[in-house]
């Protein structure tokens, strides 16, 4: 279901954006976050289409963070293939990551829910803050376990949490 909407949302005339985003979106990622959104929506007996849109938003946000993370960490491999920044360079990777974030927010507006927009906007801020804290502590050999877990929570757990929480909003 999601892959159809992902494909239609990425159907644009710019080959560089399509190639770069598609390189990651069409890779062998597990897509656990959007799957959680869909499964929990079904468990809550949701019958609309907002769950699919939200799942795609989550996948776009997640992939944007991966594109940015590979640039920051100078990653060369992602999901067993050359990373996007290794193929197209850092500038393109950052900009396509920004493009995916923008697409996610554009899709959120389609749901016409300020609550959903607020939650996903806050989530994006938490993800960015976690990445910034990670970068700021790269050389910190005295990083406490508490601080490390806080960073990981912001970078990783937050999007999982929201993937599970959003269905409770659309079923109200």
What residue ranges belong to the model's regions?
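Single conserved hydrophobic/aromatic residue that forms the stacking wall/gate
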Residues: 1-7, 12
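Mg2+-dependent prenyl diphosphate-binding active-site environment of isoprenoid biosynthetic enzymes
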Residues: 15-172
